[in-house]
């Protein structure tokens, strides 16, 4: 009788072999993740650059129609307030005014033009509420991890953005009759220049400020807009696109606090109402609590910020840029040749 053949058993992986395979997979994932993250950030940075270019082109279109760049913010009279909860100081800001030129004509035509008063109505005006809670494609940079958290002051919820108009080194004084003189000291050397940027605050009578042709230093040599980061918490108003005050949708007053460059970490690099203080420095959001008088360009990109120049081109400004070069890029009429590093 023929004996039955014993079935041949298939040999499986040993525990050690499985652990080796898992370890190899983990190493490969560890090697790939940074590359994937770099690709994602590169794509986000390009998206931010494209957004800035769209804002710059919209500002040019506004000038073609109105005769000048949009004001940083329209204010009630000759004086203005910068405290975010003092709504008597608010009027439409530059972003609100150029909505029709950035594919947001319905929002402007249906809501902005229907606001009966910009003063003391943030709680009750339905149209004003629709404007400040609007979120649209060009307003935010995908690199900012906090721009989805709304600001919760001044009467309710305000959507964040990541782009700001440049008031120049004189910043807070950048209004129709404000001072343009600016002096700063670097390494013991004091330099004076005209610190006005392309944008400033105007009264109700004027809905325009400087023209591109009025940028005496050359439109390609002057920052028109830059990136900013959203505030750290719901009471930090930085990055609110519908507000015109410094830190929300405008930057400036570089010389009023500490020596500033993009993404400065020191506590005086931004002076903002309800600033969270020293906890902000590690996140490129250094600030001190005070009225909104100082804010610098900021981004979540490694090593610098995107900035749209007056001619509509977008440049990446390194965090390592010198104070002098940054100040001169921020001024539209200082009359000084740019340092080589700024070109």
Model regions: which residues?
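N-terminal alpha-helical signal peptides/signal-anchor transmembrane segments
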Residues: 52-66
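N-terminal leader/signal peptides at the extreme start of proteins
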Residues: 1-15, 79-80
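Non-transmembrane alpha-helical segments in soluble domains
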Residues: 16, 56, 60, 95-103, ...
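Ligand-binding/active-site lining segments
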Residues: 68-240
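N-terminal single-pass transmembrane signal-anchor helix
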Residues: 9-44, 48, 54
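Hydrophobic alpha-helical interface faces used for helix-helix packing
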Residues: 112, 120, 167-343
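Stable alpha-helical elements in mature extracytoplasmic
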Residues: 48-51, 94, 325
């Amino acid at each position: 009788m023929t004996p039955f053949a014993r079935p041949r058993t298939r040999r499986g992986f040993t525990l050690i072999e499985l652990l080796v395979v898992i370890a190899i997979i983990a190493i490969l994932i560890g090697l790939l993740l940074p590359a994937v993250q770099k690709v994602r950030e590169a794509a986000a940075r390009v998206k931010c650059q494209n957004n800035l270019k769209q804002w710059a082109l919209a500002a040019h279109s506004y000038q073609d129609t109105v005769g000048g760049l949009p004001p940083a913010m329209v204010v009630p009279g000759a004086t203005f307030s910068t405290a975010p909860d003092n709504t008597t100081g608010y009027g439409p800001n530059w972003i609100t005014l150029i909505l029709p030129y950035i594919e947001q004509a319905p929002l402007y035509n249906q809501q902005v033009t229907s606001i009966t008063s910009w003063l003391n109505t943030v709680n009750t005006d339905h149209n004003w509420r629709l404007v400040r809670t609007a979120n649209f494609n060009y307003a935010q940079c995908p690199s900012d991890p906090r721009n989805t958290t709304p600001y919760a002051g001044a009467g309710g919820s305000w959507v964040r953005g990541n782009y700001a108009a440049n008031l120049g080194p004189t910043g807070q004084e950048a209004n129709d009759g404000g001072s343009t003189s600016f002096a700063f000291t670097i390494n013991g050397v004091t330099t004076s220049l005209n610190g006005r940027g392309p944008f400033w605050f105007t009264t109700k009578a004027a809905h325009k400020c400087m023209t591109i042709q009025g940028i005496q230093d050359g439109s390609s040599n002057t920052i028109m807009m830059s990136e900013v980061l959203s505030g750290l918490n719901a009471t930090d108003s930085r990055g609110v696109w519908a507000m015109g005050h410094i830190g929300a949708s405008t930057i400036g007053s570089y010389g009023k606090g500490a020596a500033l460059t993009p993404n400065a970490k020191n506590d005086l690099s931004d002076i903002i109402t309800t600033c969270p203080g020293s906890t902000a420095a590690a996140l490129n959001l250094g600030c001190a609590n005070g009225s909104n008088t100082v804010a610098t360009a900021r981004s979540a990109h490694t090593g610098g910020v995107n900035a749209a120049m007056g001619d509509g081109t977008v440049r990446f400004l390194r965090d390592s840029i010198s104070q002098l070069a940054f100040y001169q890029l921020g001024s539209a009429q200082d009359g000084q040749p740019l340092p080589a590093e700024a070109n």
